């Protein structure tokens, strides 16, 4: 009986730590989504737009993960599957914007891109640090960690895009990086969906 109680307390403690971490990273991503989305439209950057949609997807993902923390493996797998679908939708929106920019080219602001991609990198670095200890605990937390890791790559890519826009005085580097980010999102969506489906099988 004591052993059962200890196990139950340990599980409750783990869920409490997961919930606390998810609340923190949810707020960070929600704030960064609003800031980077505004910057993307102001700076006319498709790469920044993809970055902001990534933050929105993560904020929604963390909200869903909060729901799944105390649920069983099947519910967690279903939530992970939904996360994968959200990532896929974000990638699709980026692809639509890329096509729009190819048809209607503009020169993005490399200053805006640089400032907000660096701010995003710092914010997502904090999120990754907070999520690191939870990355192998279950399918729910591993899929959350996957999202956060993608954000770091996304921010670094936008910084490279900003440098490219500055050096070449062209919007093409922005489109190239946005395309790469869309590919990363699609790959991540496939990985999360595959993992969730294997859990549900």
Q: PLM features: what roles do these ranges have?
A:
Residues 1-201:
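Alpha-helical transmembrane cores and adjacent cytosolic helix/loop segments
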